[in-house]
Design a protein with these regions (language model features):
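Intrinsically disordered, low-structural-confidence terminal and linker regions
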Residues: 16, 33, 37, 46-52
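Structured, non-membrane catalytic/scaffold regions adjacent to prosthetic-group chemistry
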Residues: 41-365
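N-terminal secretory signal peptides and thylakoid transit peptides that target proteins
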Residues: 1-20
Length: 365
């Protein structure tokens, strides 16, 4: 396991540095916030009506209990969906605290919409270079010893828009919102591989999803023996359909597209399958016209979530700089923040214990 320090973090986080985030924020002479102007070329959305609260809540009974809890009417974070079956929705990072993303705000990325799968009929088949090909239902997998871990998942395209066309009126949501962190519960993939008996010459496995596009990725088998999981629960409840219900592959630190949702098949072999998802789709174009394939690990990144557009910075008093840092190559052990465009750097405080391939919340005062 590799620990990552300041230089490693900054190498992968240049587009999200503190100086860049603060430079475009206006100073408020009276210390009051300003309303957010509309994005360029878009009509301003009317503000939602403000909920009406009693003048004195101690003078009247409150709301009754309910079957499901709900957020306060005064706090209504939303994702940014594109509204098509082949699309995505982005997490409102600027509205959240801590490191865990609420399940209903976890980012989405789909290639053929969200399938409806019956957990009693859906199975995971493991075959190929194994001694005992087997199929498992979700209940079958739940019989094995389970583990719970906290990991982030990030789409490989996260941050692309911000790097290509940076704008001063960009919030963390469109800039870095294809990134979320959750507590995941499942079984180590190594446990299932031992159950089926992996043959010695198996060096790769193919993971295939059960959605309409049957997304499939080739993965080095070393990842299965390391920390890969088959998960069925997220943040204390079964996976939501958009996150792969009833089961998905979780590859900590690997690009989001390799964490195959609605997992239905694992095939073991001696070489990559060269599917269209790893040849024409998820590749890295190079200047010489060729493309790099099979890049898996997410490099160190960070994003400042507060202050951000459309916040204003008071002309007096304290204001903390708050954000998130993460890496798929180890744990974040140090974060530094610049408020002068990179001329000087200052240590930020880490607000939670760094964990491998997970997220750290930091602040600088």
């Amino acid at each position: 396991m590799t620990d990552l320090s300041r230089r490693d973090l900054l190498a992968g986080a240049a587009g999200f540095l503190g100086g860049a985030a603060l430079a475009g924020l206006p100073l408020a002479a009276d210390g009051q916030g300003a309303a957010a102007p509309a994005a360029a070329g878009a009509a301003p959305a009317p503000p939602p009506p403000r909920p009406v609260a009693p003048l004195d809540a101690t003078k009247m009974p409150g709301a009754p209990t309910a079957a499901l809890g709900a957020r306060s009417e005064y706090f209504a974070p939303t994702r940014i969906p594109n509204g098509t079956p082949v699309g995505s929705s982005r997490t409102p990072l600027q509205d959240l605290t801590g490191t865990i993303t609420p399940s209903d705000l976890h980012f989405e990325r789909h290639h053929a919409g969200i399938p409806t799968l019956d957990p009693e009929r859906h199975t995971l088949t493991i075959h190929g270079l194994v001694d005992r090909p087997m199929s498992f239902t979700v209940d079958d997998i739940k019989r094995f010893p389970q583990i719970t871990r906290t990991y982030f998942i990030e789409c490989s395209g996260n941050g692309g828009a911000g790097y290509r066309d940076p704008k001063p009126d960009t919030t963390p949501q469109p800039l870095a919102g294809l990134f979320s962190t959750s507590e995941w519960t499942g079984v180590p993939l190594a446990t299932l591989f031992r159950e089926v008996g992996v043959k010695p010459d198996a060096t790769w496995f193919l993971a295939e999803g059960g959605d309409a596009c049957k997304l499939a990725r080739s993965i080095p088998i070393a990842k299965a023996w390391d920390d890969a999981m088959i998960v069925w629960a997220q943040n204390g409840e079964p996976l939501r359909p958009a996150q792969g219900y009833p089961m998905r592959l979780l590859l900590p630190g690997f690009e989001g597209n390799s964490n195959v949702k609605w997992l239905r098949r694992l095939e073991l072999g001696t070489k990559p399958w060269m599917t269209r998802w790893e040849t024409s789709k998820y590749t890295d174009p190079l200047p010489d016209g060729t493309a790099r394939i099979f890049t898996f690990e997410i490099d160190a990144k960070s994003v400042i979530t507060s202050p951000c557009y459309p916040n204003t910075i008071p002309s007096h008093g304290w204001r903390s700089v708050n954000g998130l840092a993460w890496s798929g190559r180890g744990r974040i052990t140090r974060v530094e923040v610049s408020v002068d465009g990179g001329t000087t750097w200052h240590d930020a405080e880490l607000l939670n214990t760094p964990q491998p391939k997970s997220t750290v919340r930091f602040q600088y005062m």
